[in-house]
From Swiss-Prot:
Organism in which the protein naturally occurs: Methanosarcina mazei (strain ATCC BAA-159 / DSM 3647 / Goe1 / Go1 / JCM 11833 / OCM 88) (Methanosarcina frisia)
Taxonomic lineage: Archaea, Methanobacteriati, Methanobacteriota, Stenosarchaea group, Methanomicrobia
Keyword Repeat: no
PROSITE patterns for the chain: MSRB (PS51790)
Protein name: Peptide methionine sulfoxide reductase MsrB
Biological process annotations from GO: protein repair; response to oxidative stress
Cofactor(s) needed by this chain: Zn(2+)
HAMAP family from the UniProt entry: MsrB (MF_01400)
């Protein structure tokens, strides 16, 4: 279940996010491909919203798409994100935003692997990461 909704003023967001995070998360920017640390992350764990900490993606659904952004074929739960039509830059895309704080995460495309066929293409700067051993959910 999604966590309680968070609402902050843009000034409050500016005070808690880095300039790059603010640009991507709050102004719907896009980081340069292959520039984010989490693109290269191979550790087991949970990817969270960098703005509010809501759990979004499991490392079990991360895959190498070759696009330069972390890619996942599914979300932890469908109530963790909201999808919006995005027709900016003369393209038809589906924007992915955090359902808890409304921050821009990236886009979802229909060219991903099985079992969903989806590719959640997410800005690395939009994400936090908690290693599996830190979550207390280690597999036996």
């Amino acid at each position: 279940m999604a966590q309680n909704k968070i609402e902050k003023s843009e000034e409050d967001w500016k005070s808690v996010l880095t300039p790059e995070q603010y640009h991507v998360l709050r102004q719907k920017g896009t980081e340069r491909p292959f520039s984010g640390n989490l693109y290269y992350n191979k550790e087991k764990g949970i990817y969270t919203c960098a703005a509010c900490g809501q759990e979004l993606f499991s490392s079990d659904t991360k895959f190498e798409s070759g696009t330069g952004w972390p890619s996942f074929y599914d979300v932890i739960s469908s109530d963790r994100v909201r999808l919006h039509e995005d027709n900016s830059y003369f393209m038809k895309r589906i924007e992915v935003v955090c359902s808890r704080c409304g921050s821009h995460l990236g886009h979802v495309f229909e060219d991903g692997p099985e079992p969903t066929g989806q590719r959640y293409c997410i800005n690395s700067v939009s994400l936090g990461f908690t290693k599996e051993e830190d979550t207390g959910k280690e597999k036996e």
